[in-house]
Amino acid sequence: MEREKLKSRLGFILLSAGCAIGIGNVWKFPYMAGQGGGGAFVLFYLLFLVILGLPIMSMEFAVGRASHKSPVHAYQALEKPGQKWHIHGYFALIGCYLLMMFYTTVAGWMMHYFYMTAAGKLSGLTADEVASAFTEMLASPGIMAFWMVVVVVFSIFVCARGLQNGLERVTKVMMIALLAIMVILAVNSLFMPGAAEGLKFYLVPDFARMKEVGVVNTLVGAMNQAFFTLSLGVGAMAIFGSYIGKEHALLGESVRVVVLDTFVAITAGLIIFPACFTYGVDQTSGPSLIFITLPNIFANMAMGRLWGSLFFLFMAFAALSTVLAVFENIICCDMELMHWDRKKSSWVNLFLIIALSLPCVLGYNLWAWDGFAIFGGAVLDLEDFLVSNLFLPLGSLVYLLFCTSRYGWGWENYKKEVNTGDGLKVHDWMRGYLTYGLPVIVLFIFAFGLYDKFLA
C-alpha cells in the first residue's frame, strides 16, 4: 500500500502544532510563569525550548521521514540487524493509548463546559454554585461518559476519512479557528481595567518573586514545562514526519511548530491575568482555573456568556487537536502491525478506546479509591503520572540515543536526514551537546519527576 502524504506544508505544521498545543498551555503555563517571576520564567522557558525541545522534536521528525513508517516499525527500518531499538516502538504505542485513556475524558469536560456556557447554564451563578457545578459533573458517570464518547466518535470519524480529506482538512480549520479565537479573547482582556497590573505581573521579570519560589524550583519548572509541552517521546510527532517529503530541513520545521506552541502558551496568559486582576481573583492552575476560577469571572463579566463560550470552544479545539493527532498515530500503528486498512483500524479503535477510557470516567465516582491519593486522587492522576513521568521522558531519551549513538541509527544518518531540504541546519559543533549533554538533562527531568512525586 502506498504511503499517504500530507497535502501541504501548512497542514504538516498545523497538525504537529495541534499535537503539541494542549490544555497544559492554558492551565499550567500562565500559572507557572506568574509564580516563577513573570518574564524571568518566560525567558528561561524559551531557553529550554531551544536547547531541549527543538532537538528532540527534530529527531522524531527525522526518524519518521527517513523510515516512512509508523513508530512501531520506524526503528526496524533504520536500525542495524540484530538491534532491539524497535522494542520502544511498542512502548510508544502503549504510551499513546495511556494518554488517550484520560485525555479523551478531559476533552469531554471542555465540550461539556462549552455547551453549559453557550446554553447560559452558568450565567448568574454564585461562586459556590459554579464550584458545585464542576463537582456535580465529576460525580456523574453518565455526563462524563457521554462527552467522552462524543470526543472519541468525532475523532475516529475524522481519522477514518483519510489523512488529507479527514485529519488534515479538519485540523487546519480547527487550528486556524483556535488561533483566531485566542487573539480575540486576548484583545478583549487587554481592554479590561486590571490589564496593566495583570500584564506587569505576568511579563515583567521579577527576580525577587523568583527567589521566593526558589531559583532552582523555577528553573526546573521552566525545564519541565518546555519539555512536556511538546508531547515528545511517544512517536506522536514521528508519524507526521513520515507523511512529508524532503523539500524542507526538519530543524526549521521544528522551529515553526515550537513558535506556534509558544504563541498559544504566552497568549493564554494575556487572556487570564488581566481578567484575574480585574475581578480580584487569585490566579490558580489546573482544573480549578479552567472550571471554577474562569467561569466565575465570565459570570460577572459584561457579555460573559459570549466570552465564556469562545474560551471553552478554544479549549475544546486545543484538546481535540491533540486527540486527533494521537489517534492518527494509534490508527496508523495498528494498520502496520495488524495489516488492516484505515477503516478497520478506525472501527476497532473506536470501541477499544471507549472501553479503555471508562476507568478514568468512573475513577471520579463509582471507582473512587483512596489508594490513588499518592498520584493525586483519581485514576486520571495515575494515568497522567505514567505518561508524563515515565513514557515521555524515557521515550525522548530513546529517540535521542538512537539518533546520536553509533549503536543506533547514528549521528551521520540523523544529520543527513534532518538537513535534507531548505532551511535551518544541524551542525557538527552541536554533536557533543546532543550526544552527551542533552541525555543527562532528560535523565534529570525523569529522576526529578519521580523524586517530586514520591519523596518531596
Language-model segments: residues:
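Transmembrane helix-boundary motif of multi-pass solute transporters/channels
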Residues: 11-48, 235-236, 241, 251-255, ...
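Select transmembrane alpha-helical segments in multipass membrane proteins
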Residues: 5-16, 41-44, 83-97, 145-151, ...
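Inter-helical loop and helix-membrane interface segments of multi-pass membrane transporters/permeases
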Residues: 3-4, 32-36, 66-91, 104-164, ...
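Membrane-interface "cap" regions at the ends of multi-pass membrane proteins
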Residues: 1-27, 56-61, 65-87, 245-249, ...
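Membrane-water interface regions at transmembrane-helix termini and the short interhelical loops
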Residues: 32-36, 84-100, 135-137, 150-174, ...
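Loop-to-transmembrane helix boundary motifs in multi-pass membrane proteins
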Residues: 5, 11-13, 19, 145-146, ...
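C-terminal membrane-solvent junction of multi-pass transporters and transport-like membrane proteins
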Residues: 88-91, 338-350, 382-442
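Membrane-embedded translocation segments of transport machinery
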Residues: 2-6, 168, 172-320, 324, ...
